[in-house]
């Protein structure tokens, strides 16, 4: 259903299910990165290393408090076993480090351990900022359709829509794709209204619940009265990481290529559909007007 809307932000997914369930058909069925990693860890990684999935624990460190709710979703369990066992926010992880006397600034830099899916690209890095998910996806779509690599995606402020940026990607013979990026749930209502009325001009829309994206998530470390400066600094750092990466496209990640070659077989295979995709349900609380008899009974009982 067009326009397609991103599904990696659990705060946004919760908002759709609880407030605007009529938008569910527009949500991409792709799981969030956390949910995908968990499902692959409990299947491919466990199989490769001969580990019983029941004995494996996946702990996720996230800037987002809504990731805790996502980890508990019934759709993200296999035979009752959650794909993600525990979610710590960045603030919670910082408390753990402090409790054990660990100061990251005093520790020499080193490479991460690489047990599983540890090679990362610029496209993976920019997921953390508003517009990054869209750009990462469009880089791969452009390559699949045209066989070429896409340059920088240019966004312009959308007229009459606060906190919304829009752009156009030319896919050659396939035509042009109109994209939009919105962050902050208070700013998405205008677009939702256009979708309901059949007037939305976009094909693909990225929505992030937190202003600025995940870099300013509810679980991030904050300082009083200076969070905007820190958000800008984090954003610039992420774009520098993207620019410095030798590989900037998801489809060129060697780990992703090996994943499909050795396990998933191909995009949209049965195994890929099972492990990389999910579904949503209407969780809207229906308001019920009490009848006269019910009201009178409450009055009578005081």
Spell out what each predicted region is.
Residues 1-302:
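Iron-sulfur-associated redox domains of electron-transfer enzymes in respiratory
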């Amino acid at each position: 259903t067009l326009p397609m809307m991103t599904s990696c932000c659990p705060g946004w997914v919760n908002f759709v299910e609880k407030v605007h369930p009529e938008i569910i058909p527009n949500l991409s069925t792709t799981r969030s990165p956390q949910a995908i990693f968990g499902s692959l860890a409990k299947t491919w990684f466990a199989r490769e290393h001969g580990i019983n999935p029941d004995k494996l624990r996946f702990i996720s460190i996230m800037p987002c408090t809504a990731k805790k709710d996502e980890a508990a979703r019934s759709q993200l369990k296999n035979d009752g076993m959650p794909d993600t066992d525990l979610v710590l926010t960045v603030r919670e992880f910082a408390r753990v480090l402090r409790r054990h006397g660990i100061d990251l600034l005093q520790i020499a830099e080193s490479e991460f351990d690489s047990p599983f899916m540890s090679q990362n690209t610029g496209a993976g890095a920019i997921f953390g900022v508003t517009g990054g998910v869209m750009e990462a996806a469009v880089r791969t779509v452009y390559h699949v359709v045209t066989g070429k690599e896409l340059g920088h995606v240019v966004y312009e402020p959308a007229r009459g829509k606060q906190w919304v940026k829009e752009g156009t990607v030319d896919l050659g013979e396939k035509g042009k794709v109109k994209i939009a990026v919105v962050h902050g749930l208070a700013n998405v209502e205008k677009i939702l209204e256009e979708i309901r009325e059949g007037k939305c001009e976009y094909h693909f829309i990225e929505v992030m619940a937190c202003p600025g994206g995940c870099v300013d998530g509810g679980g991030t470390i904050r300082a009083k009265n200076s969070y905007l400066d820190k958000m800008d600094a984090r954003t610039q750092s992420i774009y520098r990481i993207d620019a410095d990466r030798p590989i900037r496209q998801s489809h060129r990640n060697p780990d992703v290529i090996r994943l499909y070659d050795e396990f998933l077989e191909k995009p949209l295979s049965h195994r890929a559909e099972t492990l990389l995709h999910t579904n949503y349900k209407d969780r809207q609380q229906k308001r019920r007007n009490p009848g006269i008899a019910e009201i009178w009974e409450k009055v009578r009982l005081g």
